[in-house]
Amino acid sequence: MGISGAINHDAAVSIVHDGEILFAGHAERYSKKKNDSDLNDALLNDAINYGGKPDIIAWYEKPMLKKLRQLRAGQWQLSLDTSELPSQYLEKFPQLKHIPIKYQKHHYTHAASGYFTSPYD
């Protein structure tokens, strides 16, 4: 299961198995809130119903790199806020408990999104 944008902008979920996209959905389609940054149970349940329970969660950025960027930018409060750490954020979704999280390089996730949704082999 890939999770993108959750916590701060345009939350989305995808399920990919053996290079095939089994499910892709945006939180805003479920909540009817434009650019919704919060995942919701309906979206996650649909993802699991279509693609099966994931064996790993691929998170769209490395949280410690983000915290370092916030520190360098002088965003002291944000850099110290642990409520936005993916492991804590995902605790509110029981269907994702005990699934390991693998953190990805943020810009690589953008590239993967373009690659996997393109019509080219």
Language model feature labels by segment:
Residues M1-D121:
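Short acidic/glycine-rich loops and adjacent helix/strand connectors
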